[in-house]
């Protein structure tokens, strides 16, 4: 690849928990809704958000791909809700599950890893979860997602059988993959998911190698990204940029959106200036090129 940068995709989970129904079940049943229904409860400030997403997709600004049905370890969350572990109930009452050990020392691990088990019964659950999630993704966006990135970069290789069955061809993530050995207790690591290599199931790795996360860490992200791009292009490799959406959200803090979008623009303009033949594409497009 003389010059290629993949940074116009957006990773998307497609459902959120329905907290009232879960509470009514005594925390024994999991209920969820499409994220488009959740958006409706944000009020007038979020009217038309999904329509704007569609406009962005049609204009080629971004191209959503599948990240999971939900960004949540459902089994662990429900169990801890029933057992009233730590601050889990208090967070639930506020409509969230986003706890960390910094907030709640009682948590051995947060709830964000949706695929943190290797148990056979959980693999069967994940199979159904992936089928539902990928089908709903297609209903919402009008196309099938051919790439996938596991939440928290954690999944068991057996999960790839289900991903392949339901149409996924490309696995995005880091070079290092975290692999569960039991039920969210013991993990090992695989450190060879190099871009262009294939998994045991024949899925192609599209590996992240550049990061833009100014809302989380105060660094010179423009300089860091440009340096990583230069290294990748020197070795004739594509650039896959990781950036969470929180970096450009402005509903709670407008400066967060304004400042970080300007910084992102600076980085992209400088990249085009330094490498005039650079091409921007989505992760599934990059996967197609690698395969061809």
Question: Model features per residue range: what roles?
Answer:
Residues 13-50, 54-59, 64-83, 92-95:
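Aromatic-lined carbohydrate-binding surfaces of glycoside hydrolases
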